[in-house]
Amino acid sequence: MYNVLDYLKESARKYPDKVAFADIDQSITYEELYRKAQEIGSALASKISIGQPVPIFMEKSVDTICLFFGVVYAGGFYVLLDMKQPQTRLNHIMKTLDSKMIVTSQKYIEALKKKQMESDVILLEDLYGHVNLKKLDSIASQ
């Protein structure tokens, strides 16, 4: 295996129904994680450049793990922002990352609004849909 995506793909093939991750509210199998990560990666691939940071404003959860893998599929790297950080610290991180967008879930949109972040918001829920294997393979080959 060469990277974390190869590991995920192989785990989904070998153990499709085995629980990959769980939190207090939900669990996800390897096959479900693989599919959701590819859906997220396919959607994000048209929104980010390869090597671009993708700030994530969410608590750690199964959804966050899906998003982490999806960002890697899209060719970016994820930066999990601590939701408890003060606004000035978060703005400094965003400036350092030179990112104009932030990904969150509908569940955290009000908390994000309170931080008054000057970024385009992408909702995790909007990233689910179809998988573009051609696009993902193209990114993986770079």
Model-derived features: positions:
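Carrier-protein-dependent adenylate-forming modules in NRPS/ANL systems
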Residues: 1-142
